[in-house]
Amino acid sequence: MAKLTVSDGYSFNQTDFDFSSLYYGWSYTRTGTLFRVDYGNGYVDEFRGTGFKYNSSGEPTGGTVTGYSGFDYGTRLFFIEGGSVAVTKIAGAAKTYSTSDDINVIAEVLRGNDTLTGANLADVMLGFGGNDSISGKGGNDILFGYDGNDTIIGGTGADEIDGGTGSDTASYANASVGVVASLANPAGNTNEAAGDIYTSIESLAGSSYADRLYGDYGSNFLSGGVGNDYLTGSGGGDWLYGGTGADQLVGGSNTDRFIFRALSDSIGSGRDTILDFTLAQNDRIDLSAIDASHALAGNQAFTYVGTAAFSGKAGELRYDKGASDTYIFADVNGDKKADFSIHLDDAVTLAKGYFIL
C-alpha cells in the first residue's frame, strides 16, 4: 500500500514521470540505501531503498527502491513511499526516451490499495491497480482511479473524476459545507462539487453537512454522511444510506434498498423519511447491520411482529399505518419503547419480506 503525497505550491502531473535524465546528472550520491541525482539546476531526484548495487560506470544494477522524492532547491515537491520496485526497472526505463515504460514503473509501485494526496494546485493523479483513495485537495485536478473500487475526493476546484473499472465513489467527506452533487446532471453541482465532472462513477458520498445527492440512470450507492441530507437514486436499482441526521430518501424507479447501519441513523429528531417506498418495485429496508438485541452478544436479527404492540422482549420490530403515513419502530432493550424509527411518507401495509433483518 503505497502513498504518493504532493507538496503545496507544486502542480504535479503523474504522466510526466520520465527517468531518462537520470544518466545526465551533475553529481551523484551512491550508497546501498540511497541513489541521489543532482542535476545542477536546483532539481534533485532521490531514491531510497535496500541493496543498491552499481556497475563500474556508476549505473544502478541491483536492489529495491522503496521511496522516491523530487526536490527543487531543497524543497520536496512530492514523495512516494510504502511501495517497492526493482532498481533494474527504473534503470531500464531511464535508457529510453519513451515515457510509457516510466509510467509502467509507477503503475507497478501503485498496484495495491494506495493513497494519493494532491496539494493546492492543479494535479494529475492515477491510482492504477487496487482499491485506491485519491484526494486532489485544491486546484482543478484530473483524478483517475483505473482498476479497483476507488474513492476519489476532488476537493476544491473543478475536478475531472474518473473511476475507471470497478465500483467507484466520488466523495465530499472533507467538504467544509454541504454540497449538491449529481451524477446525472453535474452542471447543477454546488460548493466543493461545483465544476466537477464524473466518468465511471457509481457512488456519491456526502459531507458532514446537509447535502443533496442525486444518482443517474444506473445502479448507484448514495451515502449522506452527517447532516440532514436529501438523497435521490433516480433510475436503476439504488442503495441509499442517509447516515446520521434527519434524511430524506428517494429511491426512484426500480428495486431500491434503504440502508440503516446504527440506531443513531434514524432516531428522535434525526428520524429519516423514505419518500417513495414502493412495494410493487420490491423496495427493501435493510436493518441487517443493526444489533437488534442488547441483551445478547453478537449481532442479532430483529423479530418482526407486524402491527402488534411491543411485548417487552428485546429485538422486536413493528409498524403503525396511518391515513397517509407509516412509522416503523424497533425496541432493542425490551422496555417496550422505540429506540429507532423510520417514517414512510405513504400509507403502506408492510410484511416481514419487505425488510432485510
For each predicted feature, which ranges?
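Acidic, glycine-rich calcium-binding repeat modules characteristic of RTX/beta-roll
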Residues: 1-27, 117, 122-199, 210-303
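Extended, solvent-exposed, non-transmembrane regions
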Residues: 2-14, 29-32, 37-40, 47-64, ...
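Acidic glycine/aspartate-rich repeat arrays in secreted/surface proteins
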Residues: 11-56, 67, 255-357
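Short amphipathic beta-strand/extended segments with alternating polar/hydrophobic composition
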Residues: 43-50, 74-90, 180, 197-200, ...
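Extended, small-residue-rich solenoid/repeat segments and analogous flexible loops
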Residues: 71-126, 204-205, 213
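N-terminal helix-cap/turn-to-beta initiation motif at the start of protein domains
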Residues: 106-111, 249-250, 348-350
